[in-house]
Amino acid sequence: MASESTNGKQARSHVTKGRRQYQHQHQQQQQQQQQVRSRSSVSECDGDDSFIFEANEAWKDFHGSLLGFYENGELCDVTLKVGSKLISCHKLVLACVIPYFRAMFLSEMSEAKQALIEIRDFDGDAVEDLVKFVYSSRLTLTVDNVQPLLYAACILQVELVARACCEYMQLHFHPSNCLAVRAFAESHNRIDLMDMADQYACEHFTEVVECEDFVSVSPQHLHKLLSSSDLNIDSEKQVYSAAIKWLLANPQHHPKWLDETLAQVRLPLLPVDFLMGVVAKEQIVKQNLKCRDLLDEARNYHLHLSSKPVPDFEYTVRTTPRKHTAGVLFCVGGRGGSGDPFRSIECYSINKNSWFFGPEMNSRRRHVGVISVEGKVYAVGGHDGNEHLGSMEMFDPLTNKWMMKASMNTKRRGIALASLGGPIYAIGGLDDNTCFSDVERYDIESDQWSTVAPMNTPRGGVGSVALINHVYAVGGNDGVASLSSVERYHPHLDKWIEVKEMGQRRAGNGVSELHGCLYVVGGFDDNSPLSSVERYDPRSNKWDYVAALTTPRGGVGIATVMGKIFAVGGHNGNAYLNTVEAFDPVLNKWELVGPVSHCRAGAGVAVCDCLTSQIRDVGHGSTNVVDCM
């Protein structure tokens, strides 16, 4: 017992000494912890003096060892038989990465205990490539192996590989193969690849239509393509031609799909001469009652546009242009926080939901009147920072240049422009001394201005639009206060007649037409910016309020694009705005869209009937880059 006690004391002394040595080492370890962490091995010390050592490098060794076992056929416990190919591997490794095998090996299935498992209806090379990926995390994709690999990855539920295959196939899309890839994706329920293929087909629609696969697409897929607003086309004629091409090649589908297919063509947007000279004479259209109804709808749309009465006419998706044919939204001039007017213009790409800078005007212009007529943009009057302007310039997308045109008789800012039957009307406005009731009419062909009957009330900062054979002047300021009154011009009578007034006084408001109604947006009630929006129906001579803007906007510019009203910039009482929002009349809701680059109010906004690709992007090098305050 004595000797045991003595040995115990010696042992305790040794442990105490060892503990002191360890504590010293522990302190050194703490000082070197950052260096240790920077290496592949990580160590930590807990409060109870325990020591945690983590070696990340070991995982690489582990991974490398597994790959070596596989390549050398060592310690394998299962062989996959795919056709004539035998693949020796490890159940545990397969179960870790491939959910299909995990479910198999953890179940009561007979295969769970078999050393040889036969897999039918797979490509042997594809399964072998997948197994190699399990061990190596590497996979080589080629145009030859990607489809069998995607099939195997989908069935075996290896989502990482399936996504990689989809992305690889996307990189190799071509007009001649995108429809076949889409059909392959649909057969394997790869929604992501289907969407990728559809997006590509829409972007390259006119090329895809010329390929052999086009007439072989399913009627359901054709329906989806033709209904898309994203079709990259120059004219709805191209969509009609594509539909007829497919229909003539697939008469077996006519009983169910003839009128359904033609209904996806936006016939109302076709020119009248094309409607009557081509569509109305097509035999398969003439012989189908529902197709004739669609043709009547298109005719009624054109009658409605010409202001002829059409009972029960309704706007539909077929009367809404597709994104590529909707025109380009221009934001022209205005001013920002510095007070200096802009000569810059910004153009909105509907597809990208973003703006880019187009060629600048010759003059700086704030509170400028802007309108688009026959595919050209006109900027009239305004103030250049030194004086009021009577000059006018025109932008032609074909030349990407602004050209000076005849000047108005009266120099003014805060004017509104409207076009009715060809001529452009310049309405109201003001200078430093006077609010004007003057109205001038510009004849585009002769490049001359003439005077027409003045309004009943002077209106500076007025809004205007042409609607059903009349030009409307909405709100404004008479030099004393903002106005709620509205009047309209009868060109045949050369006379202005007042109509029902708005519910809210406003000047510096935006005005646009949508679905046969007049919308007035924002503005100022004297100095107070407004978020309210009112709608006027000329058939009932009534105003009603619709959803308000997300923020007050005085000096806002508005225009209608693709069945929505866009409100651009303005001033909210504290700062100039670069935000843009769009109103959906179906949802009765405003939603923010892509902002302009420059905060600006008093800009002119209009939609030009041209293609975004026609406008030269001049980059961000504007002459007036300022903040919004």
Curated annotation (Swiss-Prot):
Domain of life: Eukaryota
Pathway connected to this protein: Protein modification; protein ubiquitination
Record Gene3D superfamilies: 1.25.40.420, Kelch-type beta propeller, Potassium Channel Kv1.1, Chain A
Keyword Acetylation: yes
InterPro entries (alphabetical): BACK (IPR011705), BTB-kelch_protein (IPR017096), BTB/POZ_dom (IPR000210), Kelch-typ_b-propeller (IPR015915), Kelch_1 (IPR006652), SKP1/BTB/POZ_sf (IPR011333)
Compositionally skewed regions (Low complexity) per UniProt: 24-35
Positions of region (Disordered): 1-40
Transmembrane segments: none
Residue intervals of the BACK domain: 178-279
GO annotations of cellular component type: Cul3-RING ubiquitin ligase complex; nucleoplasm
Chain positions found as N-acetylalanine: 2
GO BP of this protein: protein ubiquitination; ubiquitin-dependent protein catabolic process
Biased composition (Basic residues): 11-23
Annotated keywords: Acetylation, Kelch repeat, Repeat, Ubl conjugation pathway
Domain BTB span(s) in chain numbering: 76-143
Function as written in the Swiss-Prot or TrEMBL entry: Substrate-specific adapter of a BCR (BTB-CUL3-RBX1) E3 ubiquitin ligase complex required for The BCR(KLHL8) ubiquitin ligase complex mediates ubiquitination and degradation of RAPSN.
Annotated protein name in UniProt: Kelch-like protein 8
Species this chain originates from: Mus musculus
